[in-house]
Amino acid sequence: MTTETERATMSYGIDPERDSVAFARYRAHMDVIRRDRPTVALVLSGGGAKGAAHISVIRYLEREGIPIDLVLGTSIGGLVGGLYSCGYDGEELEAIIRGLDWDNLLYDSHSRRYDALSQKDYDRQYQLSIPFGTYKWDFLKPETSRRSLLRDGIVQGRNIEDLFSALLVGYGDEVDFLSLPIPFACVASDMISAKPKVWHSGNLVEALRSTMSIPGLFTPVKSNGMVLMDGSMRNNYPAEIAKQLGADIIIGVDISSPSLEASQMRSMLDIVIQANDVLGRESYNAGLAVTDIYIQPHLNDFSLLSFDKESIDTIMQRGKQAVDAAAEEINNLKVRLGNPYIRRSHNPLIHRATNLNRTAVKIDSVVFQGIKDKEKRYLRRMLHLENDGERVIHIVELEEAISTVMGTKAFEKVTYQLLGDEEPYTLQFNCFRAPTNQFGASMRLDSRDFTSILLHYGINTHQLTGGRLDLNARLGYNTRIALSHTLSSGRGVEFGTTLSFQSVQNGDFRSSSYNFRIDHLLNRAEAHIAFLPWRQMSLRMGFQLDYLYVTSILTDINLQTDEMEYIDKENVFPSPYMTIRHDSFDDPYFPTKGVLYQIRYNMYFKGLMHDSPQTHAIQFHLRSALGSGRLTLLPRVDARYVSNDLYPYVNMLSISDANKTLDQQVTFVGISTPYTTMKMLSSAGSDIRLRLGKKHYITASAQVLHEADSFGDYFDKELSQWHIGFALEYAYSSLLGPFRFNVHWSDLTRSFGVYCGIGLDF
């Protein structure tokens, strides 16, 4: 015959029969403790950043010697309670919550330095990127190959899961939560059955991740046919469950937000909070009814995301004030429990969790889940884990490994687990595939090119190895369409071919003496081999065949006599080339540290249609970022030498990095129209950038240019020329890309100019 408590249990959760058996085991455990004294449960509600108040309560209870036999938690209460149950005391919990980088945790921040150069270029140019997988030649598994374009959450929660894995070493396998140093349970919400999921056994990391999956922010946890979201949607204050598990005395800490009036709901987060309140009100009221000591800090002026240092300090202080106010009730509890207090919860025979952030551990094997054998071999080589064997591993190594794998963009999420309850552990990487295909789009509006649009369509773009196909189109005054095929060997070498078409229809150029306009078509066939020894550097060698067709020349001078030695209406130029490139900037537009450099050499053979001399061209570009606080110094050096004035490979200046008509153009501040220069040029300059707030920037720029027609002339004051340019710019980092407005001057123009634009550079 079942008791009333058992009947309530059987009708409560998503799996009533399994829950009933587990709950009975918890009650049996409590019966053993009850032989000496009443049993005590600590119930911690959800409330985001306000969960710091839980730690103040825990520290007080520890100081007063109150035994805790069971911990129940929801959302952040589940996180704090889960760690406490695994052996972390209040002092350690406070150190953890104060030491966390919450921006990194909540938004899955990923450092740009782990991305390949090709991915850095892509991210720098495209505002919109939509992965997809809908083709039969897509190598994704059938169950994951047809992905919706809509995300089920902003953040995958990878960094949160990795934090749990680091803090819970020794409990990475399936575990019975009753066997933890303090028995524990937490609540999540199943979106399929609309019922709560009571976690009393299973993967502890998965349980903690699911109980705090805030709707709309974190993606749900999909487990055994369930789609689990934040437990606050069904039971944000699980005191009633604590009673069902056998607790005699319940100490409850309630940090939930009060119900909102219509005028108070001003954001999506407010709506989520109110919806959770409505859905979980019945269980909340039931929990209040069975609570013996109710602690409610005054935290209405804080939100779920108030994780800044000042807020955490205040929240913890408010928690201390709230538990101090309950001192009389807690003293009465001490009397009821008797003296001495028999603390049976922390069993000395049960090991506490290891904190990988403080202690390195031994592993003896590495396994990968979710990928094919070929991809496993590729990742082992990438991470230098070709051979198993006992070794010591640190948290820094694991974070580097995860970031490196995520940098391939082949996975939506990669997490790790340390399996086993003692050393040496098995290190398991869990890889969740991303769609391999991709569509990208970008647009820029500016005072030079007016409107420019960039489109990308990629097949197998995010494969670890094998071939990929990319179609890129730049639309506007200077249209360029390119079709590329790349084959990756998986060993740091790739082979590629490209066919491209470019139409330059806005080719207004100037020299120090003349103005002219040249419109042309440039079709190119290219093949290359690239060596990628590091993520931030590449060596590329190849051969290109250029077909040039000049469609229009407007000028009042004889260009072939006065300005360019060799310009044909139609010609074909074959050219081998080599490029070395490095990019370690932490941000493509507003870097504060890192170096960007490129060296390129081309040898243009004689024209195949019309005679032209063999021409050599070598170009060097270096830019670095030296940031300190809000101020960043960005020195730059450029140089280019071309042995003949062969159009379109002549030396040419660009007004900005965003407005390069030809690949070889060198940016020079202070001009409003592209300028041609003599065969040898060098320039040096620097930007000084001041950040105002989070997204506003003021930049002062100065640059010096030196040009000549030969090495000998370069050092001759009479035969070489010096130029100088200045600019003052305001920029705002918007969702569409940087908005820029600058005023500039140079002695080339001897007048002030204005540039205005919004969008990414491409």
Label each region the model flagged.
Residues M1-T74, G82-S403, G407-L419, C431-P435:
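Patatin-like phospholipase
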Residues I192, G420-E422, L626-R630, Y732-L736, ...:
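A generic beta-sheet turn/junction motif
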Residues G389, V396, D716-L719, A731:
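C-terminal soluble interaction/assembly domains
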Residues I395-E397, A401, K413-F585, L653-T667, ...:
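Gram-negative/organellar outer-membrane beta-barrel architecture
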Residues Q438-M443, P576-G693, A700:
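C-terminal outer-membrane beta-barrel translocator/porin domains of Gram-negative envelope proteins
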Residues H610-P613, F711-K717, V754:
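Short glycine/threonine-rich loop-to-helix capping motif typified by GTGT followed
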Residues R689-H723:
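C-terminal hydrophobic structural anchor segments
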